[in-house]
C-alpha cells in the first residue's frame, strides 16, 4: 500500500498580511495532479488543516473542495486536528464523512481505535491521534501520573499498543525532541512541549505534523513531511515536497518525495536601491515572488516600500543593513549591564538561544515571575 503524507496546510494563513489562499489552492491542485500521476491508497493529513481555530469561510470552502476531490478519486483520507485547529470544528460531521472514507479524529476522549486496512501483505492499522496536551489526558485518566507532554503521549500509547503482528501507522501532531524548527511555528519556551521519539518505536511509520521543515527524527519512518508552502522567510532556502510512503511486509517501509512548485516563491533579496531598481537586474526574474528585501544603502530611501512595490508587487518585508542598523543591533554588555531590566536580560538570552524573540504572552509571563521573585526577596 502507498500513501501520501501531508500536514500543516494552514488554510487561510496570512504572511505579512498577504493572504495565501490563492497560493494554497494552486498547491493543492498540484498535489491532486501528482495523485493522478502517482496512484496511492490513501492520504494522511497530520493536523493544522487551518491556520486558526475559527478559520475564514474561504478556507473552509477550500478544505471542503480538497476533501471532495480526494473522495471523488476514491481515496481514503486519515485526518487529525493540530494545535492551530479547533478539534471540535474539525471533528464536526466525522461520523458522516466516514461513509465517504474520510476518517477524521474525534475530539480526544481516550485511546484511539485503529482503522484496519488490508492488502496482500496483511493488515495495516492506522491510529489517529489529534494534538495532545497533558490536561486532556489527565481529564480522561485522572489517576495516571501525567505532568508533561511526554507523559501524556506515553500514557495514551500505553492504552493503545499496536498489534505486533500488524503493520501500524500513527498520525500525530506533536513536537518531537531533536527536530529542527522554523520561525512560522509555535514552540514553547525551553521545549516543554517536546516528546521523546522512543515512544514511537512500536509503529512502522509515524506521520507527523507540527513542524514546517521536512525531516526525519531518529529514524526514517518517524517523519515530518513539512508544509507544502513556505510560510516564513526562515524557510526561504527550503525545497518543499510531497511525501509518499509505501508499505510492504511488516517492517518494510520505503519513502520517496516529489517536489512541489509554488505559484509564488518566497525569497530573500539584498542590494542597494539603485541595483534593485535597475531594469537590467530584474528583467526576466520572478518579480511577482513574495520577497523580503534588505537594502544596503547607508541613507534611508524615501518611500522605499511603495516605490519598490511598483516593480516587486508582492514585497512583504523591507529592512536595511548598513552601518547604522548594525550599530543599533550591537549590545555592549559592560556599558549597558546595569541599565537594562531583568526582562531585557532574559529576552536577549532567549533570542540568542532560540533565534526568535519572546512573544508578548511569554514576555508578560516572565515579567510576572520576575516581579514575584523580587517581592519574595524584599519580604525575606
Regions found by a protein language model. Name each.
Residues 35-39, 119-120, 162-165, 284-286:
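Glycine-rich phosphate-binding loop signature in dinucleotide/nucleotide-binding domains
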Residues 4, 44, 78, 105, ...:
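Hydrophobic/aromatic beta-strand patches that form the interior of the parallel beta-sheet core
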Residues 55, 84-218:
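His/Asp/Glu-rich metal-coordinating catalytic cores
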Residues 72-77, 166:
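A short helix->loop->beta-strand "cap" motif at the edges of active sites that frequently abuts
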Residues 1-68, 72, 362-372, 376, ...:
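N-terminal active-site segment of His-dependent metallophosphoesterases
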Residues 112-124, 129, 222-287:
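Binuclear metal-dependent phosphoesterase catalytic core
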Residues 37, 42, 247-380:
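Accessory, non-catalytic peripheral segments of nucleic-acid enzymes
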Residues 8, 28, 48, 63, ...:
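Divalent metal-coordination and catalytic microenvironments
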